[in-house]
């Protein structure tokens, strides 16, 4: 069977590139009156929570792309439902700069708990969309390349995504008590995804 995911992969990669570009565009310090060499350094240092948020979001989008790329590499062709589920993933990914910018703007204010909860919840929604994509593929197993080898991979990925959804939901709740712990959980999750999406020796040989 001929593999027919090229156009979908190219379109998806373009959306991921747009999302990462939008994240980077938001980083910076606005011009202000009375700027000097000394107070500019102070402004740069004071904005560290914003830099952390953008770094965290970049790593998250990068690892989502890695997992997404592996998913499309393991199917022959996308069905109509798979294309729609893939579009849901892309919609949420390209909107990810919105919660990221919101956290960067309000992390040092009295609204920090709400904004971090929103950020964690939105990241969890992206994970839900990835889970739905994987479940959609498992409903149509004939599109999976080498099912004997790749079905266990999908099952492992689904288990990881369920864990991720639980952690993000917990982070969204705990944010109202400790925004720092909630952000630390989102940071820990991209470390988790870095391990979960790592190629096995067999996959690297393909």
Regions found by a protein language model. Give the residues of each.
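Multi-pass alpha-helical transmembrane bundle typical of ion/small-solute transporters
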Residues: 1-206
